[in-house]
Every structure is written in C-alpha cells, then in structure tokens.
Regions:
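Active-site-adjacent core segments of small-molecule enzymes
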Residues: 1-496
Length: 496
C-alpha cells in the first residue's frame, strides 16, 4: 500500500511551514507598513514561492502524457513447467501498478492523438519488483537501440519552429523500412484506441523464462482486454482531442470509481530455447511477431485494475518502470532494443527523479526486502542499521550474493566485435508481415480507413522527394495499397 496522506481535513487545523511551525497568514506577506516592501526574513513567503518554483520535475522524454492505476494479477493456470518466477505460480495473487501513455506527445498533449500507447506494468512480487515495460503493439519501428534517439527526434517537434512535422516523420520512416510493420499497425484502427480499457497490451520484446530445473525458454507476453477492442476513427479522435485532451485519463479513473474494474487476460507464446537458433524469423527482432500458428497463445492469468492513485504526482508521475527489473525465473534476451532499454530507462529515472528514485514508495518493493550496500546520494531516505557494513564481501554477517537464487538467465554468443545488422534468416524481410497485416488480418472497411489515414498524413508532406519515397514505401508493403494511397493523395490535392 502507498503511504498515508498528510494533512487530513479536521476542525481546528492550522497552516504550518514545511517544518511544522504555525504561520500567521495565508494571504499577506510581512511588509514594512501596509504599503511597504516585503522583508526578506518572511521565511514562509520565501518557502512558499521557492517550493512553487520547484514543483515540476523534467517530464519524460518519451511517454510524457499518461495515467495509471493499481490492481492485481492472479495466475490462474499452471505455467511452472516454463518459469520458476513466484508471481507466475498457480493461484498466486500479486499487487501491481500500471501506467498507460502516449509516446511522442508532451504531458499536456491530447491523449487521443494517433500514437502507440505505453503499457507498463510493475508487479510487486515476493521476489522483488518485476517491470514489464511494453506497448499496445507487439512490434516497434526499429530494431537497434542506437537509432532510438533519431527515431524519437523525428516524431517530436522541429527545433526551429517548435512544430510537429510530417516531412520529418516520413523522411525517417521511408529511409528505415524496418518501420513498415509498426507504421501499418499505427495507421490502422489500432493506432486510435477508443479508451485505454479497450486496447490490448504486449511485452513486445522477447524475454527468457527459466524453470525450477534450469531449462530455458523464450517468451512473448500478450494482454488481451476483456472489454473488447474498440477504436476511434480519425475524425472522432480529432473531435475528442478538441473537447477533452484528457479523455483517456478521465475515462480510466471514472470507470474504476464506478466499480467498473477493467481487466485483461495474460497469454504468452513459448518458444523452446533451441528453436531460436534455426527459426525462419529472427525471434529477437522487435519489428517482427511470432506467428500464432507456430507458437500458439498459452493462458497464464488475469490482471484487474481496481484502485485509483491517491496522488497523481507521487504515484504516477514519479513512477519509474525499468526493463532491467527482473525477478528469478525471468531474464533478458539478445533483443538489441531490449538491451539498450535495460540501460536507458533507469538512467532516465536518475536524471528525472533523482539518484534514489527506487526508494520512493511507488517504486520500492511492497512484498520483498531490500538488502544491498548502496548508500548516500541526493534525497536519501532509507539507510542500513549502523551495524551493517558498507562493503562486500565482509566477515560481519552482512548480505551476500546468491547466484542460485538470482537465476539471471543466459544464452550463448561468440564472434568478433562488429557494428552490423542481425544475421538474416529466410523470412527476415521488412515488408512481408506488414503485407500480411494489410492483406489477411484487415477486412475491407479496415483497409479503407488505413488508406484514408495514410493519405491524409502523407498528403501533408511538403517535399516531393519525401512524398514519392513514402509512396514507394507503401508499394513495398503491397502494390495495391501503394496505388490506393497515391490515388487518394492525388484526389485530395486536386479537390476531387
């Protein structure tokens, strides 16, 4: 549970300074006479203004606009043959916090913009916190973390004008064909969920599970909404952005207040460890899915959101999700995007919130002890008993590492140090899965809306070169799609 709020309303309460001293006035500064200057020793006025100047922390460089809630996850099935993780053992119920977000928009931007949605879950397990930091899409735009700053820059605002720019977005996308699968997903109905309650969530990356016998498996997570999938059209989303920029945030909070608790069923895809070496698709490529015909969904359990935060800043804005937070039985994979995020996320939290961000109640473990030798640093709150040494190893009985308990996971790799793309597998092209999404998964109405969404976006591109490259990009996804986009853009330009 979170901490007890301060300052409950009760008769006879009085205003104090931050150190508990009563103050003389909420309305008037201390001045030299009624019309004279404010004196510097009015400590309360100085404190009040100085605190106000420092209320904001840096917003997240991505996923700035968001909301969240508490709930629980209950494992209803037996997947112990695949993982020893305590939270995924049959019947175990685990407290959790989830944060939903858009990616590119600022903290005050409309949450109904067309954008992927963050789907980050913090499980407060008995073995420590496990953070599953995913999206509402099973894939992403790039497959190597070194390109992430460039990608995000292309989706943000122009440095000179401060405006978002279609040319910049399509220039990056069309020069990076690995983005085709995700852009097709984004430009379709799935890019505009009607509410956060009506969208699925995905771990997106490939992770490793380890069972009690030490057997290793590769795993992908799928959270299927129990509310059903519902989407906005572009016109509906635009209208809602003007009416209520916080529609998704408001809808989630009010649903929980009504007792209409949203829920998701968790499924996983399991790939035997050895399969990854010869599978026709690189199983660690974040721009690809694993076809369900090869690796079907296996039910794990149920996530329910049943409690709103008491304070948005303390519990949502300061919430810090890190892909590096694993628990025994769950580990990383050779996914180059995941490996980059394992570094970058906790680094961002240290900058944005502070060195000791993990000690904040929302980020600290709720069901497991913390035993380590870190100490000091800005805003340190917790500290070890004076009898505990500050170094390891020691002969004084302090905590010691336990490799068997930790179970960090592993994989084999060798070769020279190189800067190169993944080794290509037989089906590792950039367009075939996007083509399947268009040709097989979507129906006629969905394809029609996809063409409309793409053409509206590409039609706003000013550069002839970039626009033509965007047309070729969609030709590569599917010739029919490319042709329809060209025709729609031309028709809009001619006014027909």
């Amino acid at each position: 549970m979170y901490q007890t709020p301060q300052n409950p309303i009760h008769p006879g309460s009085y205003t104090t300074t931050s150190t508990g001293t009563p103050v003389a006035s909420d309305d008037h500064s201390l001045t030299v006479g009624a019309d004279g200057p404010i004196v510097l020793h009015d400590a309360y006025a100085v404190e009040k203004l100085a605190q106000f100047n420092r209320e904001r922390v840096p917003e997240r460089v991505v996923h700035a606009k968001g909301t969240g809630a508490y709930g629980y996850f209950e494992t209803t099935e037996d997947v112990s043959q695949y993982t020893r993780a305590a939270l995924f053992q049959p019947g175990v119920k685990t407290e959790l916090l989830i944060r939903f977000s858009t990616v590119a928009g600022e903290s005050g931007s409309p949450d109904t913009w067309r954008d992927p949605r963050g789907f980050a879950v913090k499980f407060y397990t008995t073995e420590g916190n496990y953070d599953l930091v995913g999206n509402n899409t099973p894939i992403f735009f790039i497959r190597d973390a070194i390109k992430f700053p460039d990608f995000i820059h292309s989706q943000k605002r122009m440095p000179g004008s401060g405006l978002r720019d279609n040319d910049m977005q399509w220039d990056f996308w069309s020069l990076n064909p690995a983005s085709a699968h995700q852009v097709t997903w984004l430009m379709g109905d799935r890019g505009l969920p009607r509410t956060l309650r009506h969208m699925d969530g995905f771990g997106s990356h490939t992770y490793q599970w380890i069972n009690a016998e030490g057997e290793r498996f590769w795993v992908k997570y799928h959270f299927k909404t129990e509310q059903g999938n519902e989407f906005f059209t572009q016109a509906q989303a635009d209208e809602m952005a003007g009416k209520d920029a916080d529609f998704h945030r408001r809808d989630l909070r009010e649903a929980i207040e009504r007792g209409n608790y949203p829920a998701w069923t968790l499924y996983v895809q399991i790939m035997p460890y050895e399969d990854a070496k010869t599978y026709r698709i690189n199983p660690f490529d974040l721009t690809k899915i694993w076809p369900h015909s090869d690796y079907p969904l296996i039910k794990v359990g149920r996530m329910v959101l049943d409690r709103n935060p008491q304070n948005f800043f303390a519990e949502i804005e300061q919430a810090a999700f890190s892909p590096s937070n694993f628990v025994p039985g769950i580990a990383a994979s050779p996914d180059k995007m995941l490996l980059g995020r394992i570094f970058s996320y906790p680094d961002a939290h240290r900058y944005r919130i502070g060195t000791n961000f993990a000690q904040l109640p929302v980020n600290a473990p709720h069901a497991a002890p913390v035993n380590n030798y870190s100490h000091d640093g800005s805003m340190r709150y917790n500290f070890n008993d004076p009898s505990v040494p500050t170094y390891a190893p020691n002969s004084l009985g302090g905590p010691h590492a336990d490799a068997e308990r930790a179970d960090e996971g592993s994989w084999e790799s060798d070769g020279e140090l190189v800067r190169t793309a993944y080794t290509l597998r037989p089906d590792d092209d950039d367009f075939s899965q996007a083509r399947t999404l268009y040709e097989v998964t979507m129906n006629d109405e969905e394809r029609e809306r996809l063409v409309s969404n793409i053409s509206g976006h590409v039609g706003a591109v000013r550069s002839d070169e970039i626009r033509e490259r965007a047309f070729q990009y969609w030709d590569n996804v599917h010739p029919e799609l490319g042709s329809r986009v060209r025709e729609a853009v031309a028709a809009a330009a001619s006014g027909s």
